[in-house]
Amino acid sequence: MNKKLYIELISLIILGMITSLSLPPVNYLMVNFFTFTLFFLFLIKKSNQHKNKKLFFFYGWLFGLGYFFTNLYWISISLTFDQNFKFLIPLTVFLIPAFLAIFYGLISFFFIILKPKKIVSSFLVFSLIFGIIEFVRGSILTGFPWNLIVYSFSNQLEFLSVTSIIGTYGFNLFCISLFSSPAIFILKDTKKNLGVCVFFFITIIFFYIYGSFYKEKFNNSVRETYDYKIRIVGSNISLDRFYLNVDPISVIKDLIKISNPIKKEKTIFVWPEGILPNISQGELIEYEWLFEKNFSQNHFLIIGINDESINNGTIDYFNSLSVYDNKLNLLDSYNKINLVPFGEFLPFKNILKLVGLKSITNNYQSFSKGKQRDIIDINYKNFYLKILPLICYEIIYSGKLFKNNNFDLIVNISEDGWFGQSIGPKQHFAHSILRAIESGKYIARSTNNGIAAIINPLGSVEQAVNFGKSGYIDFKERRQIQPTIFSKYGNKIFGLLILLYIFLIFSFNRIKNE
């Protein structure tokens, strides 16, 4: 390998690493114009120099390796809590980014196969392939749509408002085009090329204007006040509760203290995911005395707790969100359907168990997948609330959360302590912002060792218990908003954008002297 090629390959990794700076919590958005433009220019340059298409897979893979290595390193922190898993840390630090980088390798590989001769058409093909592959990454197998480049805008809410129409994948496709568009100016053959570049910059300005009007319309909408409070608890209880046989009573008392229940006030309390150690749904009744002492008939609790059921002589475990009254009568429950690979279940269990692998949580027992996600209707004792339950990283899936948008509120419970003081919990939180905008619904997020918050349909955080803190926030009023276009049609809109790009590619390809 000659020195020049070696430098080029290292540069691709560095470009991917720099691109990570655009993601939460750093959000240096402007670096994407530099990195995406250089990556596209590199592929164009190499396409004119040699015809070895297999090399192009390697180019994209290196860019993806640098990108995912720097923004997903925190996954390995989840292996530090148990001595049995520490030997896997060096493997996960490299293997997870290396696997996800395969998708970026496919981007550059398919690009060189399908690349037209004309610059603008090539640019559109690059953007389209990138956008489609990112959709595939978020859908195939269990799907992992983490750190799409659209999250660079996670603190620019006016721009993000357009996701209420075109969704996350639609805006992600646009972002790829926007960040790569300076390459058209650099490679321009005619003024028409420059016009395409200008078009994307004008469009992003239009998105900002739309977002500003959308914000004003929302802020002028009618407020609706509940006659009860929804109290969202954010706790900071150590994960040692799972490993040191911590008495569940002490954890329950801590949560009650944070919740600060007042018996005369009508309140729905929301506690984080899996917060009670070594207690299943059926065992919680043993602590009825503690709940009945501190809560009244004016109270309901939404608790993240594991459930068990016997199926053909074996025990199935579920990660559940359950609704109780103050006497711990179970009113409704949801079992998580999108499980975390290796964290909550072991893929290819029969094979991987032979080499000593097991799931990290639930005392090494894999969770089972719930049947479906139904809206939970709390209609008891003059409480009227319909919630969409989401547990932990189920919040990351765009366009797959609900078929019926007839609910009042998204309740998302999570345990972010597995990722320590890293950027992981902050990236996790950023997904909630886009889901709120897409759905046009408020999100009530209760988290242990993370960020608990009320997020409105603009994606704005109205109240929060910050990272590393304990406390609660009360949600009592909301603004009414019309159902979003995306909530009606979902990712079908992304499909329409794909067809639009294909039409433009063929149109520009027909134009002589592009």
Regions found by a protein language model. Give the residues of each.
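Soluble catalytic domains of enzymes that build or remodel membrane lipids, polysaccharides, and related
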Residues: 213, 217-489
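Membrane-embedded alpha-helical bundles of multi-pass enzymes
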Residues: 2-218, 421-422, 432-435, 447-452, ...
